[in-house]
Structure formats: C-alpha cells, structure tokens
Swiss-Prot record:
Its EC number is 2.1.1.-. GO terms for cellular component: cytosol. It comes from Lactococcus lactis subsp. cremoris (strain SK11). It comes from the Bacteria. S-adenosyl-L-methionine binds at residues 78, 83, 129-130, 148. This is Ribosomal RNA small subunit methyltransferase G. Specifically methylates the N7 position of a guanine in 16S rRNA. InterPro entries: rRNA_ssu_MeTfrase_G (IPR003682), SAM-dependent_MTases_sf (IPR029063). It is found in: Cytoplasm. The lineage of its organism: Bacteria, Bacillati, Bacillota, Bacilli, Lactobacillales.
C-alpha cells in the first residue's frame, strides 16, 4: 500500500486527510525506521508494508465506526511504536490519548515522535498496566482502551477493564478470530465487570484477515484486580 493508496483507501470511508496530516504520517514513517535501527520497534520497515500493516490497520476502529471525532479518552496498552492510538490521533486530533509501555526506550521514542508530529493531549506512562490499573488517577477514567496483538483475551481483560469508565469499551485488535479466546476468557470478562458485545471481522486491502473484539464495561471491577505485575499472564482468571 503506497501512501497514495493509503489516502485513497481512507476516502472510501469518507476520510480526507489534510496536507498536514499527510506529512505527519510521512514523518511518522521516517522516525519509525530511523529509531528502529537503535531499538526494536517493529519487524515491518518497508514503506508500503508500514502504511498497510501499521497505519491502515491501526485506524480500523475509526473506519468501522467504533471511534468518532469526539474528544474521548483512549488508553493504549503496550502500544510499542504507537499503534493503534497515534495513527488514530493523527486522523482525529480531538482524541485524548494515554499510552502505557513497560520499556523506557519506547517511551523515549514516543515522546520524540509526538513532539515532532505536533500531537497534543498525549500522555506517556512508563510502567506496567497492572500497576497503573490499581492507581486511582487512572482506574475507571477512560472511554476506550485499545490493544493490538498484546495478549490472549483472558489476560488482556485483566490488564485493561479496570481502566474503563462504566459503559466504556475495550477494543482488542488481532489477526486471528476470537472464537476460541472468547470461550477461555468468558469467566474473566464477567468477573472483571465486562461483557462481550461483538466481533468485527474485516480484511486489509491486500486480503489479510483482521478482527476487533468489543467488550463493554458494565460494572465496577473488583478492587483485587488487576493483580500484581506478572500474575495475570502466569495465572489467567479461569
């Protein structure tokens, strides 16, 4: 997907990018490749692949109507190089984005990236989601939590649901279908106060399958969750 094909694909969803936004994506690509030589951000560095598998894929929640141009708050867990939240932020600057990442080098990259791209209302937090999930400054404060290929749903639910306001949504983006994961995660989602709403299946323009699971927070997450860092991955709720 060339940059021009990226723009054309967005126009099919009635999204027209300004010259400023086009340049922001271009600079994003340049910085991603430049920093990837210093720290491991992505295995995908070829320009057309970045535009398809990082930029286009990241904005799927916008393309499929899950996130609109409202000043809602989004927490991105394990965003790595800023995916999916920062491409969405470029398209809808009104979004208030917070990113949690456990690796300080990635936070340094994201700090420079957001400054270079002129992105405002972006908060970067260095640490573990399990720790911030018990912090009253962040717990039950976000409209959306996004996570792209971070963990199985049973584990991801514990990482994320505590951060959501009531009626807020977890958007889990993955290549594979969620059917098997949902069966495993059903109990965890319920215990944590969530409810599976739907799965959106779609294809990238090259035919690759992608899926978004939408989980809505229906009630308060019990205070004991998330458990201490490392525990959810080692001992998922069953």
């Amino acid at each position: 997907m060339t940059p021009d094909e990226f723009l054309s694909a967005l126009t099919e969803f009635d999204i027209q990018l300004s010259d400023k936004q086009i340049k922001q994506f271009e600079r994003y690509f340049e910085l991603l490749v430049e920093w990837n030589e210093k720290i491991n951000l992505t295995a995908i560095t070829e320009k057309n692949e970045v535009y398809l598998k990082h930029f286009y894929d990241s904005v799927a929640p916008i393309l499929y109507g899950l996130i609109t141009d409202q000043p809602v708050s989004i927490l991105d867990i394990g965003a790595g190089a800023g995916f999916p939240s920062l491409p969405m932020k470029i398209i809808f600057p009104e979004l208030e984005v917070t990113i949690i990442d456990s690796l300080n080098k990635r936070i340094n990259f994201l700090s420079l990236l957001t400054e270079e791209l002129g992105l405002e209302n972006v908060t970067l937090l260095h640490g573990r989601a399990e720790d911030f999930g018990q912090d009253s400054n962040y717990r039950a404060t976000f409209d959306f939590v996004t996570a792209r290929a971070v963990a199985r749903l049973s584990v991801l639910s514990e990482f994320t649901i505590s951060f959501l306001k009531k009626n807020g949504n977890l958007l889990s983006l993955k290549a594979a279908q969620f059917e098997e994961e949902l069966t495993d995660a059903k109990k965890a989602i319920a215990i944590l106060g969530g409810k599976f709403i739907k799965e959106i299946a779609y294809e990238l323009p090259n035919g690759d399958e992608r899926h978004i699971a939408v989980i809505e927070k229906k009630k308060e997450t019990p205070k004991k969750y998330p458990r201490k860092a490392g525990t959810p991955a080692k001992s998922p709720i069953k």
